[in-house]
Amino acid sequence: MLGDGKEGTSTIPGFNQIQFEGFYRFIDQGLIEELSKFPKIEDIDHEIEFQLFVETYQLVEPLIKERNAVYESLTYSSELYVSAGLIWKTSRNMQEQRIFIGNIPLMNSLGTSIVNGIYRIVINQILQSPGIYYQSELDHNGISVYTGTIISDWGGRLELEIDKKARIWARVSRKQKISILVLSSAMGSNLREILENVSYPEIFLSFLTDKEKKKIGSKENAILEFYQQFSCVGGDPIFSESLCKELQKKFFHQRCELGRIGRRNINWRLNLNIPQNNIFLLPRDILAAADHLIGMKFGMGTLDDMNHLKNKRIRSVADLLQDQLGLALARLENVVKGTISGAIRHKLIPTPQNLVTSTPLTTTYESFFGLHPLSQVLDRTNPLTQIVHGRKLSYLGPGGLTGRTANFRIRDIHPSHYGRICPIDTSEGINVGLIGSLSIHARIGDWGSLESPFYELFEKSKKARIRMLFLSPSQDEYYMIAAGNSLALNRGIQEEQAVPARYRQEFLTIAWEEVHLRSIFPFQYFSIGASLIPFIEHNDANRALMSSNMQRQAVPLSRSEKCIVGTGLERQVALDSGVPAIAEHEGKILYTDTEKIVLSGSGDTLTIPLIMYQRSNKNTCMHQKPQVRRGKCIKKGQILADGAATVGGELALGKNILVAYMPWEGYNFEDAVLISECLVYGDIYTSFHIRKYEIQTHVTTQGPERITKEIPHLEGRLLRNLDKNGIVMLGSWVETGDILVGKLTPQVAKESSYAPEDRLLRAILGIQVSTSKETCLKLPIGGRGRVIDVRWVQKKGGSSYNPEIIRVYISQKREIKVGDKVAGRHGNKGIISKILPRQDMPYLQDGRPVDMVFNPLGVPSRMNVGQIFECSLGLAGSLLDRHYRIAPFDERYEQEASRKLVFSELYEASKQTANPWVFEPEYPGKSRIFDGRTGDPFEQPVIIGKPYILKLIHQVDDKIHGRSSGHYALVTQQPLRGRSKQGGQRVGEMEVWALEGFGVAHILQEMLTYKSDHIRARQEVLGTTIIGGTIPKPEDAPESFRLLVRELRSLALELNHFFVSEKNFQINRKEV
């Protein structure tokens, strides 16, 4: 963010800036840092030395363009070259060559990487910052026990604790603890140095017994004692180099490497002045930590809040990429060592180029982007989704928490999140509170902390300009910070008023003169998703959370429309998403069509290709439409073409439609929604979806697979759309079951499997009858549509390991239908229950039928009243032809500001349009409307308006599923589960209760046995249902009962059954 020259103005930072800064930091600093750590490598005889010259590294611009990388499923990466030297020590000769080390995937203008043709994004992780933390817990006797936990850069922990006898221990694991004197001695301090460097030497001397003195008499003894206790080894181990190496690897490297941030934190917490480049834990640190712990026991010092953001650090793209580079170079080091020793063994003369291979670096990055939990496939449902995905913060991932182990305190909102992490935007479900979103103005500082901007206030007499400061969570505790609601008030009023402020995690009310800093923007605490909700201050936070998640699920519509009521951030979201085409230079439009725009400016001609029907990974359609005419002069930064879900360079996710809040014959019970057929026939909520189907050809042991149109196994009508090569033609309309690509796989058939006529042909004429099975690509259920693109990707090399891939893209036009999910921007979601004819919908006093009917009972209990303000203001805006952009918390101007604005606009609309029903003083905002079926007015006045309603990606076409017959699970013999496996219904516990409630014993028996898991009976059921007979009752048990018997047998419990006749039963009764 930049502070402008004007007083109190600033610009919102680019929403992708976090990703760009991270990648730039990796290229600028991390790359050199890791390359400079690469050691000099010598052979066993110390005759040859290999080294890298870091200063000469070079990244080459990629030869392939982004668009082609996606098209051909390649990685958009840059080649890394470094100069390497091979020195012969005997002759002092040096051979220097420029060598290729490997490919590093690059970041594009959207802040994403393209790996194997797929857009991927690396999200930021929040980890516990390395350093020392003091906490206290109550033991079983109710006495406070103080502990100091040292966390290393790798996440390893070392706990210091004081027992009842005032002895200090270092706890390595739950079971193992080591005396602090032994640990300090093993790290190289003698007793005299220990006692000189502590504030309470008498406490240390109090638990120093003769036995302990002997243990720490020398460094070797201390290391042996430490090794024995750490590794739980009995007997008398002997001091050796390998023992030291094992300790170094298992203990010191994992638990004692603090890193740059850890060293800074420990110096600050323990008041030390150890140099920053000393990144390992020293005896001085441990002794100072023990001193501080003793001070805590005596009531000095403060405990640490582990959930405070000052005790967290952000692991950004730069850190993750740098870690991977370090890992790749360690692998490369092993390769070079092996190659040098191999060359000497075989008496070959090595060269730098022969020693280095590019495989370690390239494979490390490919596996990182493909497998690492923090590298995710970019969600491209709509432009908002793309941007929000890159601004996520995750507590999960390597070194972090898991959804099962994280407690409520970690998930909860903390005062230090203010202006840094959005208190609203988080995922729902098991990861609630563990995946957050960055606030709009937050940025990542040099030490991995989250910084937020504030304005510094000077005294009036100085007349200085307001200065903007970026503060980390540890800094802003010492300032009085005025909350955002003091923003709009002018100076004169502020001086007389007491204002709400934040100080040391408390919210106070103080005089204006005492304020040091103030917030810069009402949206400062929110993420992008929450900032797009108008009137958010009138909504319950749970509903705002749902809304910020649901806006990311909105499908781009075929005809987008910008919202009447917005917040003002829509334009920046659209521009930063990279979806609209923007002019990079000023000039004149020479030519424009649907595929490209030709622009002339500053002496040269520039062709800008437009995106045409590109599929996103959520199957939505990405498409650009030109917005400029031929001959028009344009400026730099002007919109040339709108993309999916943008209009005039503004985000447009939904439609402004006429809505009434009223019950209608029970069709909007429990959040169901009633809509007019106008929304279907007028293509109001029509969206395009593109599905990808692919097939590969392999070389089998019987020979290569063939793509062909000649497939004898299938009837001609299924092959009607194929061209002479056997691939579906562009523009064809295809239905379920049609062949998209004809393919034959060779197979060897047994003599017995030939038909008699085939055997005769072979015997008489010697004709070899071709044996192959068809393995065509067929269109699955629900996939009907038009073929818009076919791609035949042939990888270089053409071997059996590089199969040819054919991809077919099919476009579907989907109108809105019963079962689709729609939602507003206030967490008001619902499923469409009925589509009414236009003439049956309720209509207004000017004769207009409403488009949608919502249930009014969805508002009061959920407390999302913002939708009512938006609804009424939208109606006024549509009548006055105005668009409103409203910042949140407008009550800081005056009481009831939102209501006054809405009513004044409705009143003005009523006057200008001469429609008194728009604003009726008896029930403002409501109106009398009429039943379309009878023409009678409804009893009560109804709220009508024009809110912005989105169509979400949860569509009935993707979810509806039926099964007549299909696969069964081998173990239970019950139908498989799920749409993708063509699964069937399972009657579960709750369904059984429902049926039991009606006493339907026979239906229950059928459902649970014959039709489900009785292998013979279910075949008979199908036959008798078709013929129309009665279902025969089987005598044997169903499969699930047999499974139960088998499981009991495995527990050595035999279950036998025998038949008791009525006669025997009578005899036994008499005997009794």
From Swiss-Prot:
Disulfide bonds: none
GO biological process: DNA-templated transcription
InterPro entries: DNA-dir_RNA_pol_bsu_ext_1_sf, DNA-dir_RNA_pol_su2, DNA-dir_RNAP_su2_dom, DNA-dir_RNAP_su2_hyb_sf, RNA_pol_bsu_bac, RNA_pol_bsu_CS, RNA_pol_Rpb2_2, RNA_pol_Rpb2_2_sf
Subcellular location, record wording: Plastid, Chloroplast
Subcellular location, principal: plastid
UniProt entry keywords in alphabetical sequence: Chloroplast, DNA-directed RNA polymerase, Nucleotidyltransferase, Plastid, Transcription, Transferase
Keyword Methyltransferase attributed: no
Class in the EC hierarchy, top level: transferase
Family indicated by similarity: Belongs to the RNA polymerase beta chain family.
NCBIfam families referenced in this protein's UniProt entry, alphabetically: PRK00405.1
Reaction(s) this enzyme catalyzes, per UniProt: RNA(n) + a ribonucleoside 5'-triphosphate = RNA(n+1) + diphosphate
Gene Ontology MF terms: DNA binding; DNA-directed RNA polymerase activity; ribonucleoside binding
PROSITE patterns: RNA_POL_BETA
Protein name in UniProt: DNA-directed RNA polymerase subunit beta
GO cellular component, one term: mitochondrion
HAMAP family: RNApol_bact_RpoB
Known EC number: 2.7.7.6
Subunit (UniProt): In plastids the minimal PEP RNA polymerase catalytic core is composed of four subunits: alpha, beta, beta', and beta''. When a (nuclear-encoded) sigma factor is associated with the core the holoenzyme is formed, which can initiate transcription.
CDD domains: RNA_pol_B_RPB2
Role summary: DNA-dependent RNA polymerase catalyzes the transcription of DNA into RNA using the four ribonucleoside triphosphates as substrates.
Top-rank lineage group of the source organism: Eukaryota
